[in-house]
Amino acid sequence: MKKYLLPVLVLCLGYYYSTNEEFRPEMLQGKKVIVTGASKGIGREMAYHLSKMGAHVVLTARSEEGLQKVVSRCLELGAASAHYIAGTMEDMAFAERFVVEAGKLLGGLDMLILNHITQTTMSLFHDDIHSVRRSMEVNFLSYVVLSTAALPMLKQSNGSIAIISSMAGKMTQPLIASYSASKFALDGFFSTIRKEHLMTKVNVSITLCVLGFIDTETALKETSGIILSQAAPKEECALEIIKGTVLRKDEVYYDKSSWTPLLLGNPGRRIMEFLSLRSYNRDLFVSN
C-alpha cells in the first residue's frame, strides 16, 4: 500500500484545493453554449450571465412564451447571438433533434449545460410507478441522449458538459424518492463517463453540479411549509455553475452551508476510484 500513499495524498489535495486558475468573464466571449430548462429559474439566470459575458446561446424549455422573453433579454444583455427551440424532454426524439438544430444555429458547440427537470411534488412514495418512470426519463435518460448527441461537436472544441444535479443525488432525503433516484443516476452515469474520457483521452470535461435548496420560483412553491431552511440565491448559484464548468472542475457544490462540499464530497470514494482505475488495461480501451 505504501506505493499508493503519494498518489492518494495528491488526489486528496487535488480534491480539496481546486485549480488555481481564476475564472474570467472573457473566457465565455464568443463561446457557443446550449442551456436546457432555460425559461425560468437557474437556467434563465445562467442564460443571462452567459449573455453578459458575450456568449452565443441556444436555449430550450417547454414554454415558448417564456423562452421568447429570455432570448429578448439575452440580446439586451449583450449575447453574441441568442436563439430558442421549444419542446419537451419527455420526447427523446426531440432531445436528439434539438442538439442537431442547435449545433447548426451555433456552428458548433463549446458548452452543454443540462438543467431541465420534470415537475416534482414532495410527497410520500406509495405506488406511483409512473412518477418514477417520468423522473428517470426526463431527469436522467434525456441527459444521456442530449450529451451523446452533442459529444461529436464537443470533441472538436475540447468542450465541457455541466450536469445540474442536487444534494438529493448525493444523500437520501424524504418525500422526493423519484427525484432523488434520477439524481443519483446522473452521478453514477456521468462520473463513470468522466473516467472513460480519462481512459480514452477524450478532452471533454464533465462537471457535476450538486445544488442545495435554491430560491427558484418552482422550488419555493413546492417546498412551502415543508422545508424550513433558507434558500440560497439562484443568481449566484447560476454563476458558480458557469465558473466551475469553464474551469473544468469535476464537481461544483452550491449551498448555504460551507460544510456541504466537505461532508458530501466523499474523498473515500475518490480514493477507491483512483485505486481501482489502476487495475485496468487502459491501452485496450484507447485502441478501441
From Swiss-Prot:
The catalytic activity, as recorded, is:
an 11beta-hydroxysteroid + NADP(+) = an 11-oxosteroid + NADPH + H(+); corticosterone + NADP(+) = 11-dehydrocorticosterone + NADPH + H(+); a 7beta-hydroxysteroid + NADP(+) = a 7-oxosteroid + NADPH + H(+); 7-oxocholesterol + NADPH + H(+) = 7beta-hydroxycholesterol + NADP(+)
Q: What does the UniProt record report as the effect of altering K183R in this chain?
A: Complete loss of activity
A single Gene Ontology MF term assigned here is: 11-beta-hydroxysteroid dehydrogenase (NADP+) activity
| Catalytic activity, EC | 1.1.1.146, 1.1.1.201
Tissue specificity, in the record's words, reads: Liver, kidney, lung and testis. Brain. Expressed in liver (at protein level).
- Binding of NADP(+): at which residues? 37-63, 88-89, 115-117, 179-183, 212-218
Give its localization. Answer: Endoplasmic reticulum membrane
Residue numbers annotated as active site = Y179
What is a biological process (GO) this protein takes part in? regulation of pentose-phosphate shunt
Query: Which positions does UniProt annotate with glycan attachment?
Result: N158, N203
Q: What class of enzyme is it?
A: oxidoreductase
Q: Pfam families annotated for this entry?
A: adh_short (PF00106)
Question: According to its UniProt record, how is this protein modified after translation?
Answer: Glycosylated.
Show the Gene3D superfamilies listed in the entry.
NAD(P)-binding Rossmann-like Domain
Tell me which residues bind substrate: S166
Principal localisation: endoplasmic reticulum
**Which GO terms of the cellular component aspect does the record hold?**
apical part of cell; endoplasmic reticulum membrane; intracellular membrane-bounded organelle; nuclear membrane
Q: Which residues form the signal peptide?
A: none
Task: Say what the protein does.
Answer: Controls the reversible conversion of biologically active glucocorticoids such as 11-dehydrocorticosterone to corticosterone using NADP(H). Participates in the corticosteroid receptor-mediated anti-inflammatory response, as well as metabolic and homeostatic processes. Bidirectional in vitro, predominantly functions as a reductase in vivo, thereby increasing the concentration of active glucocorticoids. It has broad substrate specificity, besides glucocorticoids, it accepts other steroid and sterol substrates.
The record describes its quaternary structure and partners as:
Homodimer.
Family assignment from sequence similarity: Belongs to the short-chain dehydrogenases/reductases (SDR) family.
What protein am I looking at? 11-beta-hydroxysteroid dehydrogenase 1
Organism equals: Rattus norvegicus
Q: Which gene encodes it?
A: Hsd11b1
